[in-house]
Amino acid sequence: MPATAYERVVYKSPSEYHYMKVCLEFQEHGVGLNVAQFKQLLVSALRDLFGEVGAALPVDVLTYDEKTLSAILRICSSGLVKLWSSLTLFGAYKSKKCAFRVIQVSPFLLALSGNSREQVLD
């Protein structure tokens, strides 16, 4: 009786980019960042974990809210895991403890426009 042959199939994401909705939380209140400082924070988080190669990843800040320190980021799909892990491990900005919270991730920007858990159906 012949053995059954198994074939491993890996499907790569057809999407060129992934979008992340993130929020930056500080332990102390009253810390403010403009969009340029926020972008620099992302690059330094990537540099801390992955060196200059990580810092060279193309990350775009599509929207940024200075009041809530939240943003929607666009990253090439191949760099998603690197960005996510560097944000997770980032812990301080100018000697002030902080943490990135990843709220949503999707290959579709439209998916980040609303939250289905808060949707009211009539």
Swiss-Prot record:
One of its GO terms (biological process) is tRNA 5'-leader removal. It is found in: Nucleus, Nucleolus. One of its GO terms (molecular function) is ribonuclease P activity. Component of ribonuclease P, a ribonucleoprotein complex that generates mature tRNA molecules by cleaving their 5'-ends. The keyword Nucleus applies. It comes from the Eukaryota. Keywords: Nucleus, tRNA processing. This is Ribonuclease P protein subunit p14. RNase P consists of a catalytic RNA moiety and about 10 protein subunits; POP1, POP4, POP5, POP7, RPP14, RPP21, RPP25, RPP30, RPP38 and RPP40. Within the RNase P complex, POP1, POP7 and RPP25 form the 'finger' subcomplex, POP5, RPP14, RPP40 and homodimeric RPP30 form the 'palm' subcomplex, and RPP21, POP4 and RPP38 form the 'wrist' subcomplex. All subunits of the RNase P complex interact with the catalytic RNA.
